[in-house]
Each structure stands twice: as structure tokens, then as C-alpha cells.
């Protein structure tokens, strides 16, 4: 798991603000990322460091014992070289910008943990200079947390599409869970609203993580002390309502992700209008939260009841009944 830390050139903006000013900006900027619920890792602390993934339950809702589990949820930076039309942090937006240093990420995580505010870290990021540069900084932060600070709590990190495979591998040996945001359900929607991003660059690290997890499971059967690779699995997130896809299309995409990439979770984020753009929908009623809720209910049927998307919806009936949950709707039709 060890690797050589590489020198990083800190962006000048990082030296212009206090740590608390950065925290205020970068915690607020992270609120639109919903994929921070987490589970499935059973690694215990060994008594020589701090943190314990098993004891915490590791989720941002409720643990098996009913306790609410807290993760420090922040962006490494809200600087971004991309100009995604739906994102508050798009390059062309005039918003306060900030970036942490790796040491500041460590300081915040350890101080928040020692004060019993959190039991883990959820770290996402905009793209500072390049995908590789950003991933190098994230790797350095997580490496220092694990080694210098002996932090053994839960860490969920967003992988940066387009970053070098060796950086994805490096981060996978440090994090409990990784995720790569699908962003939008279809490649066409991505091309229209996020012209700097490409579907292939998203699916490539997703496939690498899947293959790494499978290989690691085989290694652990032979040598139980082999370093773990993303032991809590991977997840993804897609925005719902920013593009015209039907619920049937969205559930079909989710079903394929579960089957082909063995994801632990697909998260659905109701589109929140934060920018004015001719290509973005106008939602007089606000974010489609009830639609998001129905998708989560249907997702549960896919993951735990073995349903297929075509059993719940079809081309003739492409959207869920907002007045009836998908399971009840299916029962009434059968």
C-alpha cells in the first residue's frame, strides 16, 4: 500500500484564506453530492491508531443499531477547469473559490474526529489544473491520514475521471469506498450539459475499480493479510430531471450498472437549478423530489428483490406513478 509522496504545487488561492473560511465554502459546495451513504466494510481498528470502521457502522443516515453516523463531507477544491451547465462550481460561475492542502484535510478530519463530530470522511473535488494533479493531491491527503495520522476510520473518496490508472489504483488501496459520478443517465445528455466530460472517461475507472475489487478478493483467499482494495465497494450518482430521460431509461441504466460493474449503490439526485442556461429545464415546482423518491424505491426492488427494470416499467409506461410506490403499483398490475 505504500507509495512515494510526490511534490505538489499548492494553488496560490489556498494561502489567502483561513482554514475555517475554506471549510465554510467547501462544505457548502459539497451539499449537492448525495452519494455519501456507505456500508459494507468490517475493518476494525488495531489499537495503534484512531478510528474504527466497524464500530461506526459507516453510513450517513442510520446504522444497524439505529444511530446516525456522521461523515465529514467536503470538497478538496471547488476550483474547476470544466464548465458543466448544471454545476454551481462550473468554470464560468463567479463564486467564492477555495482549495484545501492535503495537510489541512488531515487536520480537519483528525480534529473533527477527536471532538466526536464525525466517524469518517467523504471527500469529493472539483478539477484543479488537471485530473492527474487533483488526484495526486487527494492521494497525498488520504495517504497522510492513513500513515502519518494512523486514521483507521471510514474514508469514501470520489475518483476523478480522466486521471491515470495508477492514481486510481493508489487511492483504492487507501480508501474504503470509491465512487465515480455517472453525472447524467445518457451519453447524449452528458455531451449536451457537460461538454468537457466524456462517458468513456467515467466508465474506464469504474471498470478498473470493479476489476481491482475482484482481483483483491481472490488475493485475500490466498493471503489474508493482502492489502484491501476498496473493501466497501464502489457507487455512483446521476442527476434526475436535468435531461429528458424517462424513469424506464434511468432504471435500465442503473440495472446495467449493477450487473456490469457490480456497484454497491446507485444514487439519484433530483436536479436543483443553480444556474441559468438555455439548455437547462425550468422547474416551476422545484426539484423533482418525489420522482427521486420513487427511483430509490424502485432501486431497492432491483437490489434486494431481484426485480428487473422491464418488470416495473416499459416503453408504453415509461414513468412511475408519483401517487403510488413502485411495489404497490406492480402488485396492482399483477
Outline where the language-model segments fall:
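Short, charged beta->alpha transition segments
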Residues: 72-74, 103-114, 221-223
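Canonical Radical SAM [4Fe-4S] cluster-binding loop centered on the CxxxCxxC motif
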Residues: 74-103
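Flexible, acidic/Gly-rich N-terminal and inter-domain linker regions that tether
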Residues: 1-79
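Short acidic, glycine/Ser/Thr-rich loop/turn "cap" segments at secondary-structure junctions
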Residues: 89-95, 121-131, 155, 190
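Hydrophobic residues within beta-strands of alpha/beta enzymes
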Residues: 87, 120-123, 178-180, 266
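Short Fe-S-cluster ligation motifs
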Residues: 108-124, 298
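Hydrophobic, secondary-structure "cap" segments at the distal end of domains
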Residues: 304, 309-334
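Conserved AdoMet/S-adenosylmethionine-binding subsite of the radical SAM
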Residues: 106, 129-312
Amino acid at each position: 500500500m505504500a507509495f512515494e509522496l510526490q511534490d505538489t504545487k499548492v494553488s496560490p488561492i489556498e494561502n489567502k484564506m483561513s482554514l475555517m473560511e475554506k471549510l465554510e465554502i467547501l462544505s457548502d459546495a459539497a451539499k449537492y453530492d448525495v452519494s455519501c451513504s456507505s456500508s459494507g466494510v468490517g475493518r476494525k481498528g488495531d489499537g495503534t491508531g484512531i478510528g474504527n470502521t466497524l464500530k461506526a457502522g459507516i453510513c450517513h443516515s442510520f446504522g444497524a443499531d439505529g444511530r446516525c453516523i456522521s461523515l465529514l463531507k467536503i470538497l478538496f477544491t471547488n476550483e474547476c477547469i470544466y464548465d458543466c451547465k448544471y454545476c454551481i462550481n462550473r468554470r464560468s460561475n463567479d463564486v467564492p473559490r477555495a482549495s484545501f492542502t492535503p495537510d489541512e484535510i488531515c487536520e480537519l478530519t483528525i480534529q473533527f474526529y477527536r471532538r466526536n463530530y464525525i466517524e469518517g470522511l467523504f471527500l469529493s473535488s472539483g478539477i484543479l489544473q488537471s485530473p492527474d494533479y487533483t488526484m495526486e493531491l487527494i492521494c497525498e491527503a488520504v495517504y497522510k491520514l492513513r500513515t502519518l495520522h494512523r486514521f483507521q476510520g471510514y474514508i469514501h473518496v470520489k475518483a476523478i475521471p480522466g486521471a491515470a490508472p495508477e492514481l486510481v489504483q493508489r487511492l483504492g488501496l487507501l480508501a474504503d469506498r470509491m465512487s465515480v459520478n455517472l453525472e447524467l443517465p445518457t451519453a447524449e445528455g452528458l455531451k449536451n450539459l457537460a461538454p468537457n466530460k466524456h462517458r468513456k472517461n467515467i466508465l474506464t475507472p469504474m471498470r478498473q475499480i470493479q476489476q481491482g475489487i475482484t482481483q483483491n478478493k481472490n488475493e485475500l483467499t490466498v493471503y489474508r493479510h493482502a492489502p484491501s482494495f476498496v473493501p466497501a465497494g464502489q457507487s455512483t450518482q446521476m442527476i434526475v430531471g436535468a435531461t429528458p430521460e424517462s424513469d424506464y431509461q434511468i432504471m435500465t441504466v442503473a440495472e446495467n450498472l449493477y450487473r456490469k460493474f457490480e456497484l454497491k449503490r446507485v444514487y439519484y439526485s433530483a436536479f436543483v437549478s443553480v444556474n441559468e442556461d438555455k439548455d437547462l429545464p425550468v422547474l416551476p415546482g422545484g426539484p423533482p423530489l418525489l420522482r427521486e423518491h420513487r427511483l430509490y424505491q424502485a432501486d431497492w426492488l432491483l437490489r434486494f428483490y431481484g426485480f428487473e427494470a422491464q418488470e416495473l416499467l416499459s416503453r408504453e409506461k415509461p414513468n412511475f406513478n408519483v401517487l403510488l410506490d413502485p411495489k404497490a403499483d406492480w402488485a396492482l398490475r399483477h
